[in-house]
């Protein structure tokens, strides 16, 4: 590798979330600010909402005048 062209790597970079959670990781920046982390994201907290996509087949059949019975 060429000398002097690579950014300095910090093994103890602090990641701060908008919810107040913070943890360390490796990065070329000393501090990272994020809006969502594993402590506040709905997927990880179990408060995830299932999006109902029901009715798509019926809508398709209605659009093309198909009778599935």
Swiss-Prot record:
Would I find RNA-binding among this entry's keywords?
Answer: yes
Entry's Gene Ontology cellular component terms: ribonucleoprotein complex; ribosome
Return the SUPFAM superfamilies for the record.
Answer: L28p-like (SSF143800)
UniProt KW keywords: Metal-binding, Ribonucleoprotein, Ribosomal protein, RNA-binding, rRNA-binding, Zinc
Q: Name one GO molecular function term.
A: metal ion binding
In terms of superkingdom, the source organism counts as Bacteria
Any single Pfam family the record assigns to this protein = Ribosomal_L31
Q: Which InterPro entries match?
A: Ribosomal_bL28/bL31-like_sf, Ribosomal_bL31, Ribosomal_bL31_A, Ribosomal_bL31_sf
A GO biological process held by the record = translation
The cofactor note reads: Binds 1 zinc ion per subunit.
Q: Which cofactor does it need?
A: Zn(2+)
Binding residue positions for Zn(2+): 17, 19, 37, 40
Q: Where are the transmembrane segments?
A: none
HAMAP family to which the protein is assigned, alphabetical: Ribosomal_bL31_1 (MF_00501)
- What subunit structure does UniProt give? Part of the 50S ribosomal subunit.
Instruction: State the similarity comment.
Output: Belongs to the bacterial ribosomal protein bL31 family. Type A subfamily.
Provide the function of this protein: Binds the 23S rRNA.
What's the name of the protein?
Large ribosomal subunit protein bL31
């Amino acid at each position: 590798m060429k000398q002097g062209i690579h950014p300095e790597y910090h093994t103890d970079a602090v990641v701060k979330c908008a919810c107040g959670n913070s943890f360390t990781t490796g990065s070329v920046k000393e501090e990272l600010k994020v809006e969502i982390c594993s402590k506040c994201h709905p997927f990880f907290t179990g408060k995830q909402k299932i999006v109902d996509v029901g009715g798509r087949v019926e809508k398709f059949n209605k659009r093309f005048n198909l009778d599935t019975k």
